[in-house]
């Protein structure tokens, strides 16, 4: 048991003195306090141009947390979330997606800089966040962004009908279908072309945001010029059609980026790290590659300490879904289909940026791929986003951990993969033609995990006792001790180093000894009474009167001369309210009808005793209390005991196809044999269905054609008769003949143009 559990523990604090002697000779301790193999290139430190030394080559890439409060400033949730990454042993953590202007943001829950707030107000909110990020000496760099035309209507403080800004008035094209075009036009519209004054304002906003980040304690900033954001919009010819000083040539399109970097360098202290996130370009287009290389040289000369290579925009989100080629490889099940998306572009620009470390982000899913990229010199650092969300302790527990430990056998690097769940959008949503919808579906699981992590302040070992939920293990420095772990959703605890399920018979002390947690970090919480969701224990549940016919005074535990208070009433409502059934185990055991009847009596007692006139009438005359009235027939049927519906094994509990399968298996005492179908039979069924559909369509077409011909013949006949009558009326005839014709026409009109004898005779004579 101890060997099995211990094999998951890689925290240095869990190794005692005896275990230190057993470490392999090739094992060393890096700057993050992690035991790594001496020849592992991923674990070697690197020094940036600014003098900042990173302990290893793993970077927690920037992510959009989308959980900022209304004031757009980080709160305790951000501290909790980034504290997990700070404990993970990352070489650098990119705290992502901070918008430099609260008027232009990507989502309503983005962190941003509200320039109506003072510097002190912003620094006061950022400083605790930076302290949490910098825990354990982790180097944290804040990513600064401006979405430009990718800011939807209503997302910022600029107003619902105010336009977003962009280098040129070029609208987003998020799909070619009518639905995609309509949705894009509604959400984003056509941006307003920026004036020179607007550009100067954006440059100053980047500079102020960087200065505030430095004052708050961050080690640096990363200027986001990728993913289709404003600065990338200036760099690209697709969105920048200007002919002034900020467009027309590669150098002019890069001018705003150079100005932003120069302005930041002017306001931050020496040694402050300034990096850049850059989009990859199509290597098949020599023109695009040539322009990009020219721009990268200008940006490098402006002074950057690293360049992060990524890719994708809102129009083509390859940063999430990967390039088209990689997606096709993944569908075919080819190996390494998800390995680095943008490594080829990094290789192409590497010779043109000597001395500038390159970070490649996107698509790394194996330790082998990471190590080969670093060892081969194709990149200096590797950025991980989704794997970092799944496991914030990834460097410490997986990538940089030694191959051989005292707890288990050697694990080959080629067998170690990084989990990153891929969630496909439903077929019907794909037909809309908006790739961003697929991205939203795919990102939902990681978004949920980030929001789960923000609830936990700190924990590295988690013990889950399904059969004894009153016990828990938690870190002593957690304010809110983690309890009742078995009732929580499983994905909440993927952020913790280990989750162990044990039996009620397991010796808790022996288990803790086997895990060997550091005594200054962990302790076993004492057995606690089960807690309700409102925070009170079960022993606080008020007793129900023992008498079979309680009075309102009995129910609310009052004497006749006591002044009325709602304290007891509130307690009982929290317990017996129909929406809270099951929150208190002691009450949950009561039949459903009994709970409802008690709740009715509680409400009736409160209504009577809280009204002085009703209470006086009840005290003197004994009227107004309905607790003893016999139930009506309708109430008897409605409140009849129906707990049998909720008994285990009852068919009424089945809600899905899987429930019915399990129910039949339990009833029959065996698993039902599945019915398999060969490929030939399946193909035959498909062909038959197609033939049936074809015959049905052919029959419908023939019937429709026949009906059309009959309708056409009837219409031609009616038109011919009308023409014949009109011709006869207009011919030269005597007065008597015209009167006679008029009378017959009137007769025909009355009888819906039924042919008269005169018409028949005329047609026959003709």
UniProtKB/Swiss-Prot annotation:
CDD domains: DnaJ
Record lineage: Eukaryota, Fungi, Dikarya, Ascomycota, Pezizomycotina
TM stretches of this protein: 675-695
Matches recorded under PROSITE patterns: DNAJ_1, DNAJ_2
Amino acid composition bias (Basic and acidic residues), ranges on this chain: 14-24
Protein residues bound to substrate: 224-227
Polar residues bias spans: 1-13
Top-level class of the enzyme under EC nomenclature: oxidoreductase
Keyword vocabulary terms for this entry: Flavoprotein, FMN, Glycoprotein, Membrane, NADP, Oxidoreductase, Transmembrane, Transmembrane helix
Domain J: 551-622
EC code(s) of this entry: 1.-.-.-
Membrane topology: Single-pass membrane protein
Protein name: NADH-dependent flavin oxidoreductase iliE
Entry's family note: Belongs to the NADH:flavin oxidoreductase/NADH oxidase family.
Localization of this protein: Membrane
Glycosites: 30, 70, 136, 634, 650, 654
Annotated SMART domains: DnaJ (SM00271)
GO CC terms, sorted: membrane
Function, in words: NADH-dependent flavin oxidoreductase; part of the gene cluster that mediates the biosynthesis of ilicicolin H, a 4-hydroxy-2-pyridonealkaloid that has potent and broad antifungal activities by inhibiting the mitochondrial respiration chain. The biosynthesis of ilicicolin H starts with formation of the tetramic acid by the hybrid PKS-NRPS synthetase iliA with the partnering trans-enoyl reductase iliB since iliA lacks a designated enoylreductase (ER) domain. The cytochrome P450 monooxygenase iliC then catalyzes the ring expansion of the tetramate to the acyclic 2-pyridone.
Binding, FMN: 61-64, 143, 385-386
Pfam families reported for this sequence: Oxidored_FMN
One annotated GO molecular function: oxidoreductase activity
Region entry Disordered, spans: 1-24
């Amino acid at each position: 048991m101890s060997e099995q559990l211990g094999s998951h523990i890689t925290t240095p604090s869990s190794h005692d003195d005896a275990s230190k002697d057993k470490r392999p000779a090739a094992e060393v301790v890096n700057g993050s306090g992690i035991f790594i193999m001496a020849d592992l290139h991923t674990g070697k430190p690197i020094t940036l141009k600014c003098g900042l030394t990173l302990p290893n080559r793993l970077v927690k890439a920037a992510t959009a947390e989308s959980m900022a409060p209304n004031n757009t400033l980080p709160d305790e949730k951000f501290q909790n979330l980034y504290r997990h990454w700070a404990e993970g042993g990352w070489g650098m953590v990119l705290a992502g997606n901070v918008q430099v202007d609260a008027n232009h943001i990507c989502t309503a829950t983005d962190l941003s800089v509200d320039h109506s707030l003072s510097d002190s107000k912003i620094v006061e909110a950022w400083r605790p966040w930076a302290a949490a990020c910098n825990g354990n000496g982790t180097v944290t760099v804040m990513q600064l962004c401006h979405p430009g035309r990718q800011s939807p209507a209503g997302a910022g403080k600029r107003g619902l009908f105010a336009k977003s800004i962009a280098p040129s008035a070029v609208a987003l094209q998020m799909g070619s279908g009518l639905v995609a075009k309509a949705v894009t036009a509604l959400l984003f519209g056509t941006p307003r072309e920026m004036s020179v004054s607007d550009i100067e304002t954006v440059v100053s906003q980047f500079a102020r945001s960087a200065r505030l980040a430095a004052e708050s304690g961050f080690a640096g900033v990363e200027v986001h010029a990728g993913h289709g954001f404003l600065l990338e919009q200036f760099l690209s010819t697709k969105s920048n059609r200007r002919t002034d000083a900020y467009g027309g040539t590669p150098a002019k399109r890069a001018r705003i980026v150079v100005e932003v970097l120069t302005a930041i360098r002017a306001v931050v202290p020496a040694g402050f790290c300034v990096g850049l996130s850059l989009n990859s370009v199509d290597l098949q287009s020599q023109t695009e590659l040539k322009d990009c290389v020219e721009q990268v040289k200008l940006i490098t000369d402006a002074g950057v300490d690293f360049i992060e290579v990524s890719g994708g925009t809102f129009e083509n989100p390859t940063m999430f879904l990967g390039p088209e080629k990689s997606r096709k490889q993944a569908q075919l099940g080819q190996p390494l289909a998800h390995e680095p998306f943008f490594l080829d572009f990094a290789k192409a620009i590497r010779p043109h940026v000597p001395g500038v470390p390159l970070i490649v982000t996107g698509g790394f899913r194996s330790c082998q791929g990471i190590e080969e990229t670093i060892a081969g010199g194709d990149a200096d650092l590797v950025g991980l986003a989704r794997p970092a969300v799944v496991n914030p302790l990834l460097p410490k527990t997986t990538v940089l951990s030694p191959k051989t430990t005292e707890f288990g056998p050697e694990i080959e690097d080629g067998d170690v993969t990084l989990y990153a769940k891929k969630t496909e959008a439903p077929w019907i949503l794909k037909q809309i033609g908006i790739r961003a919808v697929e991205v939203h579906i795919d990102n939902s699981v990681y978004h949920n995990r980030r929001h789960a992590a923000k609830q936990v302040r700190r924990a590295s070992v988690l013990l889950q006792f399904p059969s004894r939920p009153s016990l828990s293990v938690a870190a002593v420095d957690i304010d809110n001790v983690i309890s009742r772990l078995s009732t929580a959703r499983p994905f909440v605890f993927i952020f913790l180093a280990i989750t162990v399920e044990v039996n009620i018979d397991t010796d808790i002390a022996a288990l803790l000894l086997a895990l060997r947690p550091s005594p200054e970090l962990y302790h076993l919480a004492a057995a606690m009474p089960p807690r309700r969701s409102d925070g009170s224990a079960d022993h606080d549940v008020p007793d129900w009167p023992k008498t079979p016919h309680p009075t309102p005074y009995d129910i609310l535990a009052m004497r006749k001369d006591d002044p009325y208070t709602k304290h007891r009433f509130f307690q009982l409502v929290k317990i017996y309210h129909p929406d809270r059934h099951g929150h208190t185990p002691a009450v949950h055991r009561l039949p459903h009808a009994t709970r409802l009847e008690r709740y009715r009596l509680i409400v009736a007692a409160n209504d009577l005793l809280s009204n002085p006139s009703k209470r006086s009438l009840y005290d003197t005359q004994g009227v107004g209390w309905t607790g003893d009235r016999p139930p009506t027939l309708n109430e008897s049927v409605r409140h009849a005991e129906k707990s049998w519906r909720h008994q285990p094994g009852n068919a009424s509990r089945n809600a899905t196809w899987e429930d019915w399968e399990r129910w039949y298996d339990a009833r029959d005492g065996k698993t039902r044999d599945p019915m398999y179908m060969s490929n030939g039979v399946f193909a035959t069924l498909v062909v038959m269905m197609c033939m049936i559909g074809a015959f049905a369509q052919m029959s419908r077409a023939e019937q429709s054609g026949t009906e059309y011909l009959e309708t056409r013949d009837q219409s031609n006949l009616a038109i011919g008769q009308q023409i014949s009558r009109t011709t006869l009326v207009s011919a030269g005839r005597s007065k008597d003949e015209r009167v006679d014709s008029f009378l017959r026409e009137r007769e025909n009109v009355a009888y819906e143009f039924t042919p008269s004898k005169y018409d028949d005779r005329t047609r026959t004579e003709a």
